[in-house]
Each structure stands twice: as C-alpha cells, then as structure tokens.
C-alpha cells in the first residue's frame, strides 16, 4: 500500500513517504497538487488549480513530484512486509525488567502498579530469584550479545543490597557467556544518598529519574506515604546525581502529565531550569473514571501544547542549547531496524518482566494478571506457552487493521500492547487516544529536524 502524509507546521510544508521513510519540504504549489495527485490526471489538476497557479508552474511542480515517485522517494511500495529479517525472525529474550521491589515509599495517584505492589502483597525480590533471572536472560538470548536489565518496581532502592549483588553477579556471568549486560535503574529518588549515587553512576548504563515537573504539579501527584510532598526530597538528589554522571552514560528525567497540567511544557522547561538536559514527559494512561485521566476532548489543547513546545525547542537548539525531549528525538537517516519498526517493543518474546516470586510476564504492565503468566523461574523446565508468545509475536502493524493505512505505523510500531488490551480487550486494536498523541509527537519531531537542517549551521 502506497502512502504519504503531509502537514504544515511552523511555516514548513512537510511531506512524508511512509514506506520509504523519505521526508520532503515542498513549496505551496506542490503541497496543493498532492491533494489531487493520486486520483486526478495532470490535465484535471491544471483545471482545478487554474485560479491559484499558472499552468506552466503546475506542470513543473507536477513533474518534480513524478520524478520523486519514479526514484522511489514518494508513494513508494512497502518492502518491509516480505523482508526476510521480518518473515524469518526468530526472537530471543534480550531484555529483562526486574521488579526487585513490589513496594514503594510514594503513593503516586496515577500509579499503574497500585502504589508498588501491583495489586498483591508487598514483597522484595530475593537474591536467588534475581540470579535465576540473569541466568534465564543469558540462556535464552541465543547469539544476541548486548542484553538489557532494568531494575524496576515499586521502588528498586528499597531492595538496594540485592540490586548491588545482582550487578556484581551479572558482571561475573557476562564475559564467560560472551555477553554485555547494560543495567538501567528507574527510581523515584527518595532513598538516594551519596553511596547509591556513586554506584548508579559507575554501574548503570542508564538512570531514569521520576519527576513530574513544577513543585505543585509533582507534589500533587507524587506524595509520600504520609501525604507530604516529595519534590523537596528528591530534586536535590537528582541534581547531584546528574551533575556527577559520567558523559559516557545516559539518564533522563521522566515525568507524567495529567489533566491537571495540560500546560506540561512548563514542566519540561522547569526540568531544564533545574539543569536536566535529557527529559521526557509521558501522558497519563488511565480510565476516564479518574478525574486526572486524559480524554478525547483534551486533544486540541494537548496538540497545541506539543506544537508550541516543538517550535520553542527548535529555536533553543538552533541557539546551541543541548536540551533534548525524548518524544521529539528522531533519526531520519538511520532509524530502528525493520523488525523494530513493525513489531515494536518485543514484549512476550524479546522482553519479559520478572516479579519477586519468580513469575515471568510479557512486560511489567501485565504483572498481577494471572492469565499472562509465562512461567516461573523456579520451574524445573521453563516452557513459555506458545499461545501467548504467538499472540504477542503476531501483534504487529500488518495484523492491526487500524495500523495498516496509518502513516505513523513505522514510527510508533503499533503502540503499546498492554494499553490495547486494557482499553479495548484486544491486543490488535490500538489505544486510540495514545495513537493521536503519538502522531502529533512524530509531526513535531520531524518539524524540528526540518528547522535544524534548513536554518542550522
């Protein structure tokens, strides 16, 4: 299926070739011609635009578009569906989410983990389960060399000694197995101290720091267990960690915006004011029965907020500022591999989550839903049910009706499986509100690149 997407933003006429990935900046006449290009003859297009453009200019612009099409840069065919790397893929486990703590010292109002215990009892992962998880990852990773382990929760710092021992264990096991394990930790920062900061900065390839933005916004959504604000507790610790972080390691400050702060660009700018250059702020995902949940009626304001902030960020980057916003980061020259573009996160096949008692789930969003348990690390033989593996493996953009004609499918890769199931009861029916926001973020990201390429040094 040949697809393009065109839109206008910040003075640019942007045209995307969906299948090939080419992005074009075109003049007004070419932009108008594309309204009719597929369905009308050149003669008819000349007639339709007679009151707007001279005949010769229409012909010239049309011929330029036709040349792009002939070169495979516009209305290109889809070569991914039958690509050998997709058709013949044999996924192996390459990433673990280790829920080392089903407990938390905050009680965030939007928490999908139900304040850390995922709807069960509070518990911490024993060291032996963590070691079995790393063994499982190494054994199931096939020829894959680079592996990922994310210490998650709940709040992983509540099980700090086990985290340290598991890093040590991973380092002991990786070289003999010919692997390279990259560790990540996601933390709310409450328990950070100098010892933990030093260890994280030395051993964690990435650190995800949970902060929602301005003090009133953060404290309103992320109170402590005794209903006090947590902003003043965590911000100084995060600033210290980031100021001491080695340049060869990553971090990002990650927030969540809700209906209470639809002006979330102010929260992102607050991150920058605090000295955090690498940021992300995610839309809350929750049922509309919660007053802070996003609704379709919020989309116009959210779209405007994204677009206004993209224009601002482009200007900042033109001035040499290093601020980066995760959702506006895009590589137009060398993006994700074919499989990643089509299948997304790999949950249930390439990525799994492990709970403190050793249960294996497709990802952390499914923890607590017994029907999605893939096995347990204490089983003598771990045989992940083929039915569940297949369900996730086949949940790619070509099997999702809403994705097949969508221009954004190779950027969002079909969206979040958990959101599809939670909102629609069907892994092949994407969460529409999330789709709409993702489309706007992609448009903004490409506009920023257009601005930098045309006006940068």
Model-derived regions: residue spans:
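Acidic, low-complexity/disordered tracts enriched in E/D and polar residues
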Residues: 1-37
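Conserved alpha-helical substructure of the radical SAM core
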Residues: 52-67, 71-198, 203
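Hydrophobic faces of well-ordered beta-strands that scaffold small-molecule active sites
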Residues: 96, 147-149, 183-185, 207-209, ...
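Short Fe-S-cluster ligation motifs
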Residues: 134-152, 391-392, 429-457
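Non-cysteine beta-strand/loop elements that form the S-adenosyl-L-methionine
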Residues: 197-215, 277-285
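Radical SAM enzyme [4Fe-4S]-AdoMet core and its adjacent flexible, acidic
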Residues: 216-235, 239, 243-347, 371-373
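C-terminal accessory region of radical SAM enzymes
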Residues: 301-334, 364-413
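Cysteine-cluster motifs in flexible loop/terminal segments that predominantly coordinate metals
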Residues: 393, 397-444
